[in-house]
């Protein structure tokens, strides 16, 4: 069983502080954010990370039971590929069905307001779309604490780009990826693997420290 190192716990603490800062916002125009729930994989280091992060979040944020479908794994075969053993192919096929199941469980659009569903288009539709982009107390946020391969795959899937490209992306330990899904179905990636809250000295990826690797 892999658990967090002292550096990993420090990274998780800094991530919790950063999320708390984002949730509070700056003023009425930029925040606060309505975070509903924290979800986490069933792996020990993810559960430790979530525990440390949640110490900084409002008590109103729900904690769900760990979900093994969010556990780390090989989410799909990647392109460009390399020669793989039969066991690796089998693990990838198993990982794909599990991680895809988690993606479909958590990534979906909200129902559109009735006022927009009955709209006949034109300027009112444009105004509604513009209103969606503004800070709004009805916007709901979820935090998912999981793993690099899962995050990269789900980002590709959410953006509707080939998921086989997942290995071309890089998400550092305790980085933040921020996706928005509108009721209209539009999806935007506002942050991918952001580590500004960690600083160079505490930035790591898969055993590598810093950026010169």
Give the label of every model feature segment:
Residues 1-3, 51-137:
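Phosphate-handling substructures
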Residues 36, 138-149:
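Generic beta-sheet signal
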Residues 21, 55, 59, 70-88, ...:
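Acidic, low-complexity terminal tails and accessory targeting/binding regions
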Residues 11, 46-49, 95-106, 150-151, ...:
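Internal, well-ordered alpha-helical segments in soluble enzyme and binding-protein domains
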Residues 1-66, 89, 173:
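Active-site-proximal alpha-helix that buttresses catalytic centers in soluble enzyme cores
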Residues 44, 70-71, 149:
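Catalytic metal-binding/acid-base residues of hydrolase active sites
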Residues 148-152, 188:
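GST superfamily/GST-like fold recognition
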């Amino acid at each position: 069983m892999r658990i967090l190192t002292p550096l990993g716990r420090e990274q998780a603490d800094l991530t919790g502080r950063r999320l708390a800062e984002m949730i509070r916002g700056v003023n009425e125009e930029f925040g606060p954010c309505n975070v509903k729930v924290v979800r986490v994989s069933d792996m020990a280091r993810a559960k430790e990370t979530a525990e440390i992060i949640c110490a900084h979040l409002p008590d109103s944020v729900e904690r769900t039971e760990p979900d093994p479908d969010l556990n780390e794994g090989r989410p799909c075969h990647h392109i460009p590929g390399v020669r793989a053993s039969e066991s690796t192919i089998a693990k990838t096929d198993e990982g794909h069905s599990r991680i895809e199941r988690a993606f479909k469980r958590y990534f979906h659009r909200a129902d559109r307001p009735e006022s927009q569903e009955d709209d006949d288009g034109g300027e009112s539709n444009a105004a509604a779309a513009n209103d969606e982009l503004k800070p709004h107390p009805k916007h709901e946020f979820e935090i998912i604490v999981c793993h690099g391969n899962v995050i990269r795959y789900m980002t590709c899937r959410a953006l509707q780009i080939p998921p086989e490209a997942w290995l071309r992306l890089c998400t550092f330990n305790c980085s933040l990826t921020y996706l928005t899904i509108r009721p209209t179905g539009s999806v935007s990636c506002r942050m991918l693997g952001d580590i500004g809250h960690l600083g160079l000295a505490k930035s790591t990826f898969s055993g590598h420290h810093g950026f010169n690797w």
